[in-house]
Amino acid sequence: MSQHIRKLDSDVSERLKSQACTVSLASAVREIVQNSVDAHATTIDVMIDLPNLSFAVYDDGIGLTRSDLNILATQNYTSKIRKMNDLVTMKTYGYRGDALYSISNVSNLFVCSKKKDYNSAWMRKFPSKSVMLSENTILPIDPFWKICPWSRTKSGTVVIVEDMLYNLPVRRRILKEEPPFKTFNTIKADMLQILVMHPMISLNVQYTDKLRINTEVLFRSKNITEGLTKHQQMSQVLRNVFGAIIPPDMLKKVSLKFNEYQIEGIISKMPVGLKDLQFIYINGRRYADSAFQGYVDSLFQAQDFGEKGMSLLKTKSVGKPYRSHPVFILDVRCPQTIDDLLQDPAKKIVKPSHIRTIEPLIVKTIRSFLTFQGYLTPDKSDSSFEIVNCSQKTATLPDSRIQISKRNQVLNSKMKIARINSYIGKPAVNGCRINNSTINYEKIKNIRIDGQKSRLRNKLSSRPYDSGFTEDYDSIGKTITDFSISRSVLAKYEVINQVDKKFILIRCLDQSIHNCPLLVLVDQHACDERIRLEELFYSLLTEVVTGTFVARDLKDCCIEVDRTEADLFKHYQSEFKKWGIGYETIEGTMETSLLEIKTLPEMLTSKYNGDKDYLKMVLLQHAHDLKDFKKLPMDLSHFENYTSVDKLYWWKYSSCVPTVFHEILNSKACRSAVMFGDELTRQECIILISKLSRCHNPFECAHGRPSMVPIAELK
């Protein structure tokens, strides 16, 4: 290999750059549909052939002339801008002249287009020149794709992308191995962004199977009229794209204005198990700061958002084993800057130019919502988060009949989509006023930094299971002493006796870590609970590995799920089967499907006890955990010739066990363990400590609380 610096061949350079700009089928679909929107299309149809990494987009936009078609997909050729300052007032998605150029370098691209009142349509198979489309023209594309001729008064464009990444085989193989639901969910999120900004566009997305025999509707834009308010349109768009993931009356309107900044959106009153339905748009572009998104979600978690719904379930859970997140769409409008448009090829905003104003306003909107819903009490001492205070006089907003009361925010509970309205700024409008000093970005920034530092400290201070860690405060010197106890220490100990019918006092004799023996107090309930929990996990995984897992047939157990959830269950059906959970998905409407539960493991059947809401929650939790890699698939292939389970290291597979099984086994171990107040003989104490010393993680009970604490050094 030459050691001299040389310019890359143009072919290699183009492939590398194109792969960076267009890395997936979903991103290519997004770029083409955005081009259709820029062409003022009112109807857009998308057909996706995922197995072949191909798709087609049909629109009724203004179309292309022959001359424009011949220079289409040429790098840095665009009709959107002429000079840099044009970006400030630009209203279109595209402007770089890069998207089609990149797609054409990694796929077979075909475009056919017609301008209104032109006699002819023109087509082009890249990189060839355009030719006229006639009845006798043989189309240079797969016969699966259909092109209907336009009448003289009509216009439109058809873009067909075939065999994406055909010249990048490794990247193509990786893309083809990606689960279909992930690609479809990405497309849904991208199309939602377009429809939130352009709700009146009729956007229909379909996909075909591997044999191209059957086609399914991914989603269809419908029931959007000009008579709906913006917030009602948002609610319907969300339902159209992601299905009936949340009832419409559970979405509340929020609205806030401060000088040139305005936020309008919807927030759900009830949570869902999916965190992916949280969208913030700034001037129509997705805000992609994951740190801030996490901070916003933490505002809800800190107030136990959704706990009211959990309390309504007939089946109760100990602690908070199941995650829940709000659904929200926030549309932020502010002065547009060139810097915001140049941050990401996918047209996302990573760090907005007006971040010092936008982020505090978003936080204020969230906290106002939480306050009105009763989750949060206004903290007047924290000016960066204080809620907008309105005067006692009532006033009528110009765009509604809602009256502002003495309350911090306004909500009209008579409407299905209620409203929270506030105006911030000088002079006061409708009796609402707040000083600019309350928009304090630095406090939010510090909170985010503190949160990141806290997470880092937790990672750095985490200990492996073979050691326990505690802090002892010296009341005289006011110092902290670190004690580290390994499992090997527990192999050499002496049981002294039971203490107060609650604890077992032991003396650890191993001096390899400490220079002198230690007195350790062991929680007898936590000790027995840990022993029983590990025995239960070993038994459970042994049954799964050996195929002796007991499942019970169910009848008439159907659960309604939305289409997005149905796709998730379809993909992980075989994984659920390993745990004795058998089901079939039944296609329903465009918004909902049915999950027919066929079998459940015996332990889950007893816990479920007819509570379908609880069952849906725990099944969705595991599906989302698998999707987010919080749980790993249970690989049983290397157990096919497994004859002995004596050496089954169960802890290696604990990350595969569904959360609901963890909950059930934790509860079972807790209820059957020795309790506080139970009197134990010294021999019984010896047996307990002996079993604890053989546990994989002897330092925690089933719920994560410490099972022992060092109390003294015997010097």
Curated annotation (Swiss-Prot):
Q: Name one GO biological process term.
A: mismatch repair
Q: Keyword Nuclease on this protein?
A: no
Q: Which Gene3D superfamilies match?
A: 3.30.230.10, Histidine kinase-like ATPase, C-terminal domain, MutL, C-terminal domain, dimerisation subdomain
Fetch the InterPro entries from UniProt.
Answer: DNA_mismatch_S5_2-like (IPR013507), HATPase_C_sf (IPR036890), MutL/Mlh/PMS (IPR002099), MutL/Mlh/Pms-like (IPR038973), MutL_C (IPR014790), MutL_C_dimsub (IPR042120), MutL_C_sf (IPR037198), Ribosomal_Su5_D2-typ_SF (IPR020568)
Keywords assigned by UniProt, alphabetized: DNA damage, DNA repair, Nucleus
Quaternary assembly? Heterodimer of MLH1 and MLH3, called MutLbeta, which is involved in correction of a specific subset of IDLs when associated with MutSbeta. Forms a ternary complex with a SGS1-TOP3 heterodimer during meiosis.
Q: What does this protein do?
A: Involved in DNA mismatch repair (MMR), correcting insertion-deletion loops (IDLs) resulting from DNA replication, DNA damage or from recombination events between non-identical sequences during meiosis. Component of the MutLbeta heterodimer, which probably forms a ternary complex with the MutSbeta heterodimer that initially recognizes the DNA mismatches. This complex is thought to be responsible for directing the downstream MMR events, including strand discrimination, excision, and resynthesis.
Q: What is this protein called?
A: DNA mismatch repair protein MLH3
Q: Which organism is it from?
A: Saccharomyces cerevisiae (strain ATCC 204508 / S288c)
Phylogenetic lineage = Eukaryota, Fungi, Dikarya, Ascomycota, Saccharomycotina
